[in-house]
Amino acid sequence: KLPVPHGETKTCSGMAWGYNPFIAEQSEYHSAYLAVAESVSKLVATGFSAKNAYLTFQEYFERLGADPTRWGRPMASLLGALDAQVELGVAAIGGKDSMSGSFENIDVPPTLVSFAVAAGNTDNVVSPEFKLPGSKLVLLSPAMRDGLLPNAGSLKLLWAQVETLIKEKKVLSAYTPSMGGLAEALFKMGLGNRLGVRFAPGFDAAKLFGYAYGSFVLELAEDIDVGTPIGETTARYVWELNGETADLAKVQEAYEAKLEPVLPYRTAEAAGPAQEAPALKYEALNRVAPKVGTAKPRVLIPVFPGTNCEYDSARAMERAGAEPEVFVINNLTPAHVAESVAAVKELIGRSQMIFLPGGFSGGDEPEGSAKFITAFFRNPAITEAVRGLLQKRDGLMLGICNGFQALIKLGLVPFGDIVETDDTCPTLTFNTIGRHQSMLVRTRVASNLSPWLQYTKPGDVHTVAVSHGEGRFVAGAETLDRLVKNGQIATQYVDLSGKPTMD
């Protein structure tokens, strides 16, 4: 979705890719043609129009030398891509090539990856995961030629049909099969919400494992007569076909463990027995409110070198009814820093909130996050202004990501004041898996004491996005007990059943 400083837009961009190295080893022409068809079909399955699509190609071939056969491989690929563009009515506007894909006696497979891009409307975007149990599943396929390539005219009509069905809200989810055929498509569609498939009586299992380029699997929002029936989604995380059952949990485990030896997705501790976590509950009976109300509170959002979500933060505050003021900290010279300190002190004096947004202030150097923000707020003038806001004017502070790390390291969390911290104080440290994590997680409200959570109830579960390398909160047992008692544990991670977990 394209951001705008003020207002709302539904314009968004989409990008998809297509390539199959196994086909490329057999026929460079067919591989390139299908790469174009696949990349555009992926856009269509997401809710974009093929008429708005443009292409860019990434080409990578073995060193050509004086071998005519080697020279013929990129030529065949380009001919396949050109025919696809002409016949399907979509043009490439950029690309990059390399003819150095050889090392001693090892050559890369002939490679032409098609990237398709398009602008669209967020109202039409659909995601690929199954949404509901009991939904009808159908397969729409174009006419084929040469046994592998879709007929161009038939595929263009199919693109238009799928686009219309999505715009008319008759599709809950959509997917176009690629390298793994229909089996891969149905399996991946079931992953997100762990839904299975009950195949229609007499469904030919052989269809699951062949190529189906240009086809579409649709989860229908209503029972309409379109396509070839596949079956229906089920709450049971299994495939049921011709009296046999396949456990998808085991398939998922095998799928996710493929790269486990080189890129672990869980720690050794997580693979063992799960650590128990109590379900915390703290319901605030009395709330602190400012002595003097403000119809449109002012929010100061300081931007440090490396901050990267100040626009999103300001937008969220603006939509909630506040008046955000974004101020860029100038650290070019010591004199500029002093000027910024004076300006921020003045801005805090006329604000009701301070919002520290996320990012990588100072490049997360040296040796850790938020050190520049922490140093800035420990300036005596800023410390005094913050104390005046929080302790005398009943103001608020909020920190997200890098900003929350600063609140921890300043002592504002959990002590409510800028203090000198020591080894006994809570901190945020590196994830146990040893690398950055970016995913959707489920959290449960444990306490609604915070003004930011006053309209929630303990036990409410939300799905939120996380993206961090240092997201592990660490504190001593005594400190944790005190935080629990005071209602300062705001949320807990939970599993799919809503049970608190330390995983």
What function would you assign to each model-found segment?
Residues 1-9, 19-24, 69-76, 91-212, ...:
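Intein/HINT protein-splicing elements and their conserved insertion hotspots or analogous self-processing inserts
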Residues 6-16, 48-55, 135-137, 353-354:
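Short coil-to-beta-strand
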Residues 14-16, 55, 93-95, 116, ...:
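General beta-strand structural signal in soluble alpha/beta enzymes
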Residues 22-38, 376, 380:
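Glycine-rich anion/phosphate-binding loops
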Residues 29-101:
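A glycine-rich phosphate/pyrophosphate-binding beta-strand-loop-alpha-helix module
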Residues 40-49, 172-189, 305-310, 403, ...:
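Conserved phosphate/anionic-ligand binding catalytic regions in large, soluble enzymes, centered on
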Residues 242-400, 404-415, 429-437, 474, ...:
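N-terminal beta1-alpha1 cap of cysteine-dependent amidohydrolase-like domains
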Residues 339, 346, 385-388, 420-503:
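Amide-donor transfer/coupling interface in amidating biosynthetic enzymes
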